[in-house]
């Protein structure tokens, strides 16, 4: 039997080509995820640096200045130090719950970034239930805090976990009602559709102007969800030492801080998406994709401009959150729950009823 060497070479080249296609397919599948994770990491490092600089300015002192230019590498240095610290475990605690808690808190928040549009159709997963997915995922993080508090076998940690769960339930309901209002205004629960619905009318089409009361309630509720001052009752140092973080050290201790800043960033991004038109350039009847959709280079430039606009709006609200933390005193636990159940929830419910009534009358 004679085998043609040309046919064998063709078969080998074809198999190599198919293998390269599979490799490129795998790289193409994971590249957006890796890019998003890298961007989130850089964003968190910038937030940590901004918080240190803003707090130093408010307190009239010098902030970090030795680790890199203007101290911009201080957060990276702190993270590196925590990685090499020893991981201690409570002798009588539940080791499994103690170890799983920080991971659940971080992973549940990271999943929320998959539905956030950073520019025109620049989103990891454009789901029809994007907003509801964020609400569902954000309710998982307090479970991790409760597991950490229970697994620590410490009364302060356990009480902190209970506070985190109670605070989350109290402020997730107003958040959900406000998200339903935005969904009804846009006729879609997709984050991309909500941004495009606001982009049709430029600056005055933002939900900020159509729902000003809802915007302020959303801002307050998102701060409470992030457990930031004046709502950091689960970590109240004067009452609970360090809350659910009391028994932690090393990288697990650092994961809680990462989760806090990740949650703050994702909340600010959702404020931008739901109320500030996302990547909208704020010129009436013109938005980024129509302005730059001339050729391939124009589309890349338009996408870059959209990312810049989204991040500029996001970091504006991060500045507000950081300033609020360093200027307002902490609430008591009874004041926190009263604010959520007796004020924000009734106002959110009334706002929902009024909005839906006007929409039904306009049909």
UniProtKB/Swiss-Prot annotation:
EC numbers: 7.1.1.-
Query: Source gene?
Result: ndhA
The upper taxonomy is: Eukaryota, Viridiplantae, Streptophyta, Embryophyta, Tracheophyta
Subunit text: NDH is composed of at least 16 different subunits, 5 of which are encoded in the nucleus.
Topological relation to the membrane, as annotated: Multi-pass membrane protein
Cellular component terms (Gene Ontology) = chloroplast thylakoid membrane
Query: Which residue spans traverse the membrane?
Result: 30-50, 104-124, 129-149, 248-268, 300-320, 343-363
Q: What is this protein called?
A: NAD(P)H-quinone oxidoreductase subunit 1, chloroplastic
Task: Please give the biological process terms from Gene Ontology that the record holds.
Answer: aerobic respiration; photosynthesis, light reaction
Q: What InterPro entries would the database entry show?
A: NADH_UbQ_OxRdtase_su1/FPO, NADH_UbQ_OxRdtase_su1_CS
Query: Keywords of this protein's UniProt record, alphabetized?
Result: Chloroplast, Membrane, NAD, NADP, Plastid, Plastoquinone, Quinone, Thylakoid, Translocase, Transmembrane, Transmembrane helix
What Pfam family is a match, any one?
NADHdh
Catalytic activity reported: a plastoquinone + NADH + (n+1) H(+)(in) = a plastoquinol + NAD(+) + n H(+)(out); a plastoquinone + NADPH + (n+1) H(+)(in) = a plastoquinol + NADP(+) + n H(+)(out)
Query: What family is reported?
Result: Belongs to the complex I subunit 1 family.
User: Could you tell me one molecular function GO term of this UniProt entry?
Assistant: oxidoreductase activity, acting on NAD(P)H, quinone or similar compound as acceptor
Q: What does this protein do?
A: NDH shuttles electrons from NAD(P)H:plastoquinone, via FMN and iron-sulfur (Fe-S) centers, to quinones in the photosynthetic chain and possibly in a chloroplast respiratory chain. The immediate electron acceptor for the enzyme in this species is believed to be plastoquinone. Couples the redox reaction to proton translocation, and thus conserves the redox energy in a proton gradient.
Catalytic EC class: translocase
Q: Which cell locations does it reside in?
A: Plastid, Chloroplast thylakoid membrane
């Amino acid at each position: 039997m004679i085998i043609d060497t040309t046919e064998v070479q063709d078969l080998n080249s074809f198999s190599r080509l198919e293998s390269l296609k599979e490799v490129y397919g795998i790289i193409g599948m994971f590249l957006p995820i890796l890019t998003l994770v890298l961007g989130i990491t850089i964003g968190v490092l910038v937030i940590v640096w901004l918080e240190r600089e803003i707090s130093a300015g408010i307190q009239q002192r010098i902030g970090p200045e030795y680790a890199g230019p203007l101290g911009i590498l201080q957060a990276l240095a702190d993270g590196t130090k925590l990685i090499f610290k020893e991981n201690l475990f409570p002798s009588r605690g539940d080791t499994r719950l103690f170890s799983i808690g920080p991971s659940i808190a971080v992973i549940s928040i990271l999943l929320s970034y998959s539905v956030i549009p950073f520019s025109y159709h620049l989103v990891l997963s454009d789901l029809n239930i994007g907003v509801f997915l964020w609400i569902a995922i954000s309710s998982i993080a307090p479970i991790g805090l409760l597991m950490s508090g229970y697994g620590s076998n410490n009364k302060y940690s356990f009480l902190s976990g209970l506070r985190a769960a109670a605070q989350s339930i109290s402020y997730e309901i107003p958040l959900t009602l406000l998200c339903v209002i935005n969904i009804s205004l846009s006729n879609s629960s997709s984050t991309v559709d909500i941004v495009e619905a606001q982009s049709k009318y430029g600056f005055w089409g933002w939900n900020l102007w159509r729902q000003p009361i809802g915007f302020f309630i959303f801002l307050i509720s998102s701060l409470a969800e992030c457990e930031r001052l004046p709502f950091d009752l689960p970590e109240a140092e004067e009452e609970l030492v360090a809350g659910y973080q009391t028994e932690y050290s090393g990288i697990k201790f650092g994961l809680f801080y990462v989760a806090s800043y990740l949650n703050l960033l994702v909340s600010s991004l959702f404020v931008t998406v739901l109320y500030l038109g996302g990547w909208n350039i704020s010129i009436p009847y013109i938005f980024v994709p129509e302005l730059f959709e001339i050729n391939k280079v124009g589309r890349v430039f338009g996408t870059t401009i959209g990312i810049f606009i989204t991040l500029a709006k996001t970091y504006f609200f991060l500045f507000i959150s950081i300033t609020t933390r360093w200027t307002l005193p902490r609430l008591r636990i009874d004041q926190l729950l009263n604010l959520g159940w007796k004020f924000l929830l009734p106002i959110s419910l009334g706002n929902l009823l009024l909005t839906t009534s006007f929409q039904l009358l306009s049909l």
